[in-house]
């Protein structure tokens, strides 16, 4: 089969450095018997060692040319191929506990992370390679430039850890940016205390929708000036100053104050 050319519409950059590949696989530490799914196996740089260590692997791939290569290379007993868009894939069908890994396409990384977060209850952990600037947003702390909606919503559900960086030269073709490896471990359900997570998402989206505006303005759909002292929060702050716990407290306060907010979330 002829050499596959990376496709921009799928955000393809193929990992090719054997030392980096080994380091990533060691960080994942796959063990036979685990249910592991790789998103975007590409040319199989991570697929080969994963199959070797696990015995069987699930993959989700949208590129039909790459799917044909995978069918040629692996037997169904070793590799289960799920053809389609990872953004629409129901990861719950693979069972639990599930481990999710992959070199995520840069062009869909943020919506894909939000999609994957929906399956947190069924996941043991997730280890991804992403654009470094996205990873910095994922692990950012309150009060920093990178802290935003992605930070809050992922940190509400996961314990996040940036493991190490991957230089552009480790890929073919080489991207213009550095990548990072991030691990996401779901938090226990008892630590996720928002009474309604859909409402939490709305509150966080509003707080960061216009970053230069204060909470007094961004949250006025739900909170009056008198509500902020009850919460112990300064209405003159901007969204990036609040912790995840602050957003949960605001959400639960709104839910208690106005049951309609829950119904409309």
Swiss-Prot record:
Cell compartment(s), UniProt: Cytoplasm
Gene3D superfamilies: Ribosomal RNA adenine dimethylase-like, domain 2, Vaccinia Virus protein VP39
Major localisation: cytoplasm
Record SMART domains: rADc
GO terms of molecular function: 16S rRNA (adenine(1518)-N(6)/adenine(1519)-N(6))-dimethyltransferase activity; RNA binding
A Gene Ontology cellular-component term: cytosol
Catalytic activity: adenosine(1518)/adenosine(1519) in 16S rRNA + 4 S-adenosyl-L-methionine = N(6)-dimethyladenosine(1518)/N(6)-dimethyladenosine(1519) in 16S rRNA + 4 S-adenosyl-L-homocysteine + 4 H(+)
InterPro entries noted in UniProt: KsgA/Erm (IPR001737), rRNA_Ade_diMease-like_C (IPR023165), rRNA_Ade_Mease_Trfase_CS (IPR020596), rRNA_Ade_methylase_Trfase_N (IPR020598), rRNA_adenine_dimethylase (IPR011530), SAM-dependent_MTases_sf (IPR029063)
Keywords: Cytoplasm, Methyltransferase, RNA-binding, rRNA processing, S-adenosyl-L-methionine, Transferase
UniProt EC number: 2.1.1.182
Keyword Ribosomal protein: no
Residues reported to bind S-adenosyl-L-methionine: 13, 15, 40, 61, 85, 103
Top EC class of this enzyme: transferase
Protein role: Specifically dimethylates two adjacent adenosines (A1518 and A1519) in the loop of a conserved hairpin near the 3'-end of 16S rRNA in the 30S particle. May play a critical role in biogenesis of 30S subunits.
Family to which the UniProt record says this protein belongs: Belongs to the class I-like SAM-binding methyltransferase superfamily. rRNA adenine N(6)-methyltransferase family. RsmA subfamily.
Protein name: Ribosomal RNA small subunit methyltransferase A
């Amino acid at each position: 089969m002829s050499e596959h050319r990376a496709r921009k519409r799928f955000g393809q950059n193929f990992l090719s450095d054997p030392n980096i590949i080994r380091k990533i696989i060691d960080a994942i530490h796959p063990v036979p018997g685990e249910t592991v799914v790789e998103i975007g196996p590409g040319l199989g740089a991570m697929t080969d060692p994963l199959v070797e260590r696990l015995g069987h692997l699930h993959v989700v791939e949208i590129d039909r040319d790459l799917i044909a290569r995978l069918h040629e290379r692996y037997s169904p007993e070793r590799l289960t191929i799920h053809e389609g868009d990872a953004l629409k894939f129901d990861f719950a069908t693979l069972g639990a506990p599930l481990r999710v890994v992959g070199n995520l396409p840069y062009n869909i990384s943020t919506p894909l992370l939000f999609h994957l977060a929906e399956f947190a209850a069924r996941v043991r952990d997730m280890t991804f390679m992403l654009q470094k600037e996205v990873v910095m947003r994922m692990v950012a702390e309150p009060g920093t430039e990178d802290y935003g909606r992605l930070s809050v919503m992922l940190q509400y559900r996961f314990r996040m850890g940036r493991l190490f960086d991957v230089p552009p030269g480790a890929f073919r073709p080489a991207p213009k940016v550095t990548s990072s490896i991030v691990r996401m471990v779901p938090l226990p359900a008892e630590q996720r205390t928002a009474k309604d997570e859909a409402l939490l998402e709305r509150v966080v989206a509003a707080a960061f929708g216009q970053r230069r505006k204060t909470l007094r303005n961004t949250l006025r759909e739900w909170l009056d000036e008198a509500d902020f002292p009850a919460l112990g929060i300064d209405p003159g702050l901007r969204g990036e100053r609040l912790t995840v716990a602050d957003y949960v407290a605001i959400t639960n306060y709104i839910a208690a104050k106005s049951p309609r907010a829950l119904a409309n979330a």
